[in-house]
Amino acid sequence: MFLTQSELGQALVKNAKVAFNEGMKMGPTGGRQIYNIKMVTDMITENDTHSYDSIARSTGEGGTYHTSVPVKGFRLIHRQGKFTDSFVTTKEMMMFDKYSVADTLKGIQGLGTSGAKRLELNLQLGIGMGAGASYQDMDGNTVSTLGADGQNAFSATKTTKAGIAYSNLQAIAFGLAGLEAHQNLFRRMVNHSGRQVKVIPTHIYHTRTPSLVNTIEEFLNSRGNVGSPNMGVNVYGYKGPRFQTIEMEYLDANPDETRDNAKANYWGLVLAKGQELQCEISQNPVVYAPLMDNETRNLNIQTDLHFSHGHRDGFNATLSNV
């Protein structure tokens, strides 16, 4: 049966947004669980860190009050990127019922998933590729993975304005020793005033490698210490899991979404939604009304989204690139 533009338009009015939003929900979510996401209206924004971490000083009777000043840290600049997708319904598909209204709505649902997948791919590659300086994305663009300090997002030599270095990178397998090593990375972090950073991680993030997933779940939900032959008390799990977990679909991915086996056991600790891993969105994925090509009579249905992301300071996350 011939599918007219009018019929397609009516179907879109009733169902397209629902299908598109359902498609967005079907996409991965690991990156959005970690990054601090906010909406913006400007193409370019600047985010500075300020460290005001003073300690009151002893002052004698009638003495001058101690004075402290904030220390300005590093600046992270966001520039909005545009990402698009579309699909075409040809006149023949409509005319010979090869592409029904339901099929068209499935395509619109796929567009919703497409935008969500690209957002997640970029966010998660920002972590999975974060031990390097940059990578080339599927469009051939060079994407920086440097933090605002000019060092790799995850590095053994992250810098501060106080001139003191700290680390948020350690290659060690998941387990009791690994958790303690990464907790110590947090304990040793310093801010731009040179004082300790008071950040407690909330989540373990990791790839979907079954052996790693199962080890983490077993470790966090066992009353006994699964790494000890004597089965001592598991301090991370006997009162209930100390950390929540986030499975990241693209943590071990290449920029073209293929699997990178060298990153199969990547994991780390993170303060989810902390201020240092940032994502700014100026336009969430949207679907536009179909456009008819006057020369071909084909219908083109399009979507786009605009966002940027980056790492300011390295205080919120660690990475084990074992």
Question: What is each stretch, according to the model?
Answer:
Residues R75-Y135, I204, L299-T303:
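Long, contiguous amphipathic alpha-helices that act as assembly "spine/axial" helices in icosahedral shell
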Residues K91, M95, F186-S193:
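Structural motif corresponding to the C-terminal cap of alpha-helices
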Residues G132-G147:
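Extracytoplasmic/periplasmic solute-binding protein
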Residues N21-F83:
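Assembly/oligomerization interface modules of large self-assembling protein complexes
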Residues M1-M26:
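N-terminal alpha-helical "arm" segments
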